UniProtKB/Swiss-Prot annotation:
InterPro entries: Glyco_trans_1, Glyco_trans_4-like_N
Keywords, alphabetical: Glycosyltransferase, Transferase
Stored CDD domains: GT4_PimA-like
Origin superkingdom: Archaea
Pfam families according to UniProt: Glyco_transf_4 (PF13439), Glycos_transf_1 (PF00534)
Name the record gives this protein: Uncharacterized glycosyltransferase MJ1069
Length: 392
């Protein structure tokens, strides 16, 4: 079998922190174990890092000059000659397959242009991570984003040779708004289970709050994640229950200062923010906690942080959004809420605070569920079938 040359255009790539970034990095790590694949990544250089590096088993990463026109939406710096030089150099390589991820990133449009707007077209596989239209603070930006989705986004779905959804929620969103193809496959991500299991719990947090039940959230701090509803739920708890618990918010983002203000007198007195931490530290904090809260609004495909918390054996309180209703089985491995309102989150928290045995049962079941359903060997095998179909 000849080598298949694959280039991926992700919206972001590490060291930028997020579920998409780890998804792409772990996917390429496991795919690159097969020497029949020659893998390239072309991504915005945010935050500024090495312009070129080789990762895993000869995965070649190119990071081009870029900036964020609004938070979480990078665009190439078209005024920098280096961007154009890097982009046009890609045309010197005879790729078999181009992979884009998430329709609304400018890098997805770049990948589409590279694959389809040329004399010798390339096979394009689009992997969608989103399950709702973009919601921003500005109504004008929301309308602009919706228009982009319904024009450029829809074109990408229609012209792609293959479309993959990362969850059922994503597939339903695609079918309702872009293309009517019920054969779109759902391929769940894997998890680095051995790596997660090798990380110990955060002993400082465990010791400092040894007499408290520890609630935890991990993720990028922006409106989509619904963290303000966790804080409101905490504040609204009866005083006797509040005295039994603490809330640890792990992550950073444009909403960090707003959320700190919302915490009010409970900031560093019941509600604690870690700011930006690396993967190992985040997992260590989750392991030191007792309950993990997933508070997302509709939008994401399948929360990596939620899956990782389940892998850590934590009892889950989850809104039904961002794929949670596909992995959290109410009354078996967690509490699946009706929505992400403060009232619902409060209900879930109270139920688990008052029942230590239930927390242990849910946590054990969550861990087993992840081990049985989310492994990269299975995921990569499904992608390989698609790649081989496209090139043969």
């Amino acid at each position: 079998m000849r080598k298949i040359k694959l280039i991926i255009f992700p919206g972001y790539y590490i060291p930028h922190i997020g579920g998409l970034e780890t998804h792409v990095d772990e996917f390429t790590k496991h795919l690159s174990e097969d020497e029949n694949y020659d893998i390239y990544i072309f991504a915005p250089n945010i935050p500024k890092y090495k312009e070129f590096e080789i990762r895993h088993n000869n995965v070649k990463v190119y990071r081009y000059p870029a900036f964020e026109i609004i938070p979480n939406y990078p665009v190439p710096n078209i005024f920098n000659i280096k961007f154009w030089r890097m982009f046009f150099n890609l045309y010197k390589i005879d790729f078999d397959i181009v992979m884009t991820r998430t329709r609304f990133f400018s890098n997805t449009l770049l990948g589409f242009i590279f694959a389809k707007l040329r004399f010798k077209k390339k096979k394009l596989i689009h992997v969608e991570h989103g399950s709702a239209f973009v919601k921003l603070e500005s109504e004008f930006k929301n309308k602009l984003s919706y228009f982009y989705d319904k024009t450029i986004g829809k074109l990408i779905f229609k012209k792609a040779d293959y479309v993959v959804a990362i969850s059922k929620a994503v597939k339903n969103f695609i079918l309702e708004n872009f293309v009517n193809d019920k054969d779109i496959p759902i391929i769940y991500r894997g998890l680095e289970i051995e790596k997660i299991e090798s990380i110990g719990e955060d002993k400082k947090i465990k010791e400092k709050f040894k007499n408290k039940i520890k609630l935890c959230f991990v993720g990028r701090l922006y409106k989509w994640k619904g963290v303000e509803n966790i804080i409101k739920a905490y504040v609204d708890l009866p005083k006797d229950l509040k005295e039994k618990i603490i809330l640890i918010v792990v992550g950073y983002g444009e909403d960090l200062e707003r959320l700190k203000k919302l915490a009010g007198n409970y900031l560093n007195n019941g509600i604690y923010f870690t700011g930006k931490v690396d993967f190992e530290k985040a997992i260590a904090i989750v392991k030191a906690s007792d309950i993990y809260i997933h508070s997302s609004y509709k939008g994401g495909g399948l929360s990596s942080s939620l899956l990782q918390a389940m892998c850590c054996g934590k009892a889950i309180v989850a809104s039904p959004y961002e794929g949670a209703d596909e992995v959290v089985i109410d009354g078996y491995n967690g509490i699946l809420l009706k929505d992400n309102s403060p009232e619902e989150i409060k209900r879930g928290i109270i139920k688990l605070i008052e029942n230590n045995n239930l927390r242990k049962i849910y946590g054990e079941n969550a861990k087993n569920f992840i081990k049985e359903n989310f492994n990269w060997k299975k995921s990569v095998k499904e992608y390989k079938k698609i790649f081989e179909r496209l090139v043969n």
